From Swiss-Prot:
GO terms for cellular component: mitochondrial inner membrane; respiratory chain complex IV. The gene is COX1. InterPro entries: Cyt_c_oxase-like_su1_dom, Cyt_c_oxase-like_su1_sf, Cyt_C_Oxase_1, Cyt_c_Oxase_su1_BS, Cyt_c_oxase_su1_dom, Cyt_c_oxidase_su1_bac. This is Cytochrome c oxidase subunit 1. There is a cross-link at H248-Y252 (1'-histidyl-3'-tyrosine (His-Tyr)). The lineage of its organism: Eukaryota, Rhodophyta, Florideophyceae, Rhodymeniophycidae, Gigartinales. Component of the cytochrome c oxidase (complex IV, CIV), a multisubunit enzyme composed of a catalytic core of 3 subunits and several supernumerary subunits. The complex exists as a monomer or a dimer and forms supercomplexes (SCs) in the inner mitochondrial membrane with ubiquinol-cytochrome c oxidoreductase (cytochrome b-c1 complex, complex III, CIII). CDD domains: Cyt_c_Oxidase_I (cd01663). It comes from Chondrus crispus. It holds the Pfam family COX1.
Length: 532
């Protein structure tokens, strides 16, 4: 018994194996996603009808729920699953490396997250919680308005989570730049690896700015400085500039790994190489660069000069160009392909469709004149949930079904996966499509009560969220069924046409399912073959 326990501790607590750490990230992300999902359910139940009922008129609690929902979903669900989970599992295998460059750094990157999560949950439970929204703007987050320790706990939580992200980013950058197998140039690495590389650079540059901003907020609250306190000569708008200089690259950090995953899936299920590989790479890099010079489009209403607003409007619209290149390249990949509509492909097509809608509403919001009336309405909520709740999350589901057999060695039941896709698709669209109409009608964000005129669309949105909830529960049932069924997965489960053998484009389909504890006993040699 003792030896089993020590083995378990050394394997899972002191792990230096990229696959085990990736598994830990996936489990952690699923747990946090459930917590965040419960909070969104509470929000939608409160908003199902006008007037106060579920939260008994306690508007502070409502804002605490919204803040915690955002932090959980962004920092503890999407980032750990995409970068930590899929990134750790797949990047070393795809580049033919035995492990990450710094395996123990990888371990601490993960183990910083559970304490960070605990601090975040504590911040919601002490005093009156953090009712500031995820942006934590002063003066609402100042010591006068949030006098308890809740905001300080949230700040510490973000510090630790940010440290985890930076360490992980350093690890990915050095792994991808230094540990590729012989014959694998940068222009031969898979698009998912490129997406993780760009994401890691974004993290490395953006997160320290957030750390600086929240550290100044911490000293404003506790040590009598006045960085953001106008009465002491500070400027609360400075905080907004610092926060959004991090916050805008952050949304690209959330979606870029998804772009990489979708490229692989669309290519596999269309039986074609990705259309315009080099263009895809340059598009991702340009999105990463442009993401840093558009931050003030979140701040059109704070009184920026008109020429400043004109610049940020133009720059924001330019980002649509590389994004459009990616979308049209995916469509060109599907075009004339031999399409197989398995669950990962359904989620990928859903991703392309819904992400495009989210991108179009983003173009609308880029206009500073229009944004004055749409700012802080449900139109903005609809926009970023189309990009995140149907972009990032659909990419996660697509990647999960695509690589599930490879990671576990067991294949999921296809019919159940398709039911999960359709129920999720209907649920999220029913939830977020009405929010566009509410926003155009002027319903403000972060307010738990609303005039009766908005009741109809809100009820529909709440019903949609209940459908999405049940489809998520169904997803966990699928995972349970898959893991308990004895349905082994072949090395390459997506071989549909047995008579003609296709080459596989990436290394993970060459190794066994699941891969050995040490994937490569010797370095693979990568070279190009001419296709007939």
């Amino acid at each position: 018994m003792q030896s089993f326990f020590t083995q378990w501790i050394s394997r899972w607590i002191f792990s230096t194996n990229h696959k085990d750490i990736g598994t830990l990230y996936l489990i952690f992300g699923a747990f946090s996603g459930v917590l965040g999902g419960c909070m969104s359910m509470l929000i939608r139940m409160e908003l199902a009808q006008p007037s106060n009922h579920l939260l008994l008129g306690n508007h502070q609690i409502y804002n605490v729920l919204i803040t915690a929902h955002a932090f959980l979903m962004i920092f503890f669900m999407v980032m750990p699953v995409m970068i930590g989970g899929f990134g750790n599992w797949l990047v070393p295998i795809m580049i033919g490396s035995p492990d990450m460059a710094f395996p123990r750094l990888n371990n601490i990157s993960f183990w910083l997250l559970p304490p960070s999560l605990c601090l975040l949950l504590m911040s919601a439970l002490v005093e009156v919680g953090v009712g500031t929204g995820w942006t934590v703007y002063p003066p609402l987050s100042s010591i006068q308005s949030h006098s308890g320790g809740a905001v300080d706990l949230a700040i510490f939580s973000l510090h630790i989570s940010g440290a985890s992200s930076i360490l992980g980013a350093v690890n990915f950058i050095s792994t991808i730049l230094n540990m590729r197998s012989p014959g694998q140039s940068m222009y031969r690495i898979p698009l998912f690896v490129w997406s993780i590389l760009v994401t890691a650079f974004l993290l490395l540059l953006a997160v320290p700015v957030l750390a600086g901003a929240i550290t100044m907020l911490l000293t404003d609250r506790n040590f009598n400085t006045s960085f953001f306190d106008a009465s002491g000569g500070g400027d609360p708008i400075l905080y907004q500039h610092l926060f959004w200089f991090f916050g805008h690259p952050e949304v690209y950090i959330l979606i870029l790994p998804g772009f990489g995953m979708i490229s692989h899936i669309v290519s596999t299920f269309s039986r074609k190489p990705v259309f315009g590989y080099i263009g895809m790479v340059y598009a991702m890099v340009s999105i990463g660069v442009l993401g840093f010079i558009v931050w003030a489009h979140h701040m059109y209403t704070v009184g920026l000069d008109v020429d400043t607003r004109a610049y940020f409007t133009a720059a924001t619209m330019i980002i649509a160009v590389p994004t459009g290149i990616k979308i049209f390249s995916w469509i060109a990949t599907i075009w004339e392909g031999s399409i197989h509509l398995k669950t990962p492909m359904l989620f990928a097509i859903g991703f392309i469709f819904l992400f495009t809608i989210g991108g179009l509403t983003g173009i609308v919001l880029a206009n500073s004149g229009l944004d004055i009336s749409l700012h802080d309405t449900y139109y903005v909520v609809a926009h970023f949930h189309y990009v995140l709740s149907m972009g990032a999350v659909f990419a996660i589901f697509a990647g999960f079904y695509y690589w599930f057999g490879k990671i576990t060695g067991l294949q999921y039941p296809e019919t159940l996966g398709q039911i999960h896709f359709w129920s999720t698709f209907i649920g999220v669209n029913l939830t977020f499509m009405p929010m566009h109409f509410l926003g155009l009608a002027g319903m403000p964000r972060r307010i738990p009560d609303y005039p009766d005129a908005y009741a109809g669309w809100n009820l529909i949105a709440s019903y949609g969220s209940y459908i999405a909830l049940f489809s998520t529960l169904f997803f966990f049932y699928i995972v349970f069924v898959s893991l308990t069924s004895n349905n082994p997965c072949t090395n390459f489960p997506w071989e549909f046409n047995k008579s003609k053998t296709y080459g596989v484009s990436t290394l993970e389909w060459i190794v066994t399912s699941p891969p050995a504890y040490h994937t490569f006993e010797e370095m693979p040699l990568i070279y190009e073959t001419k296709s007939n």
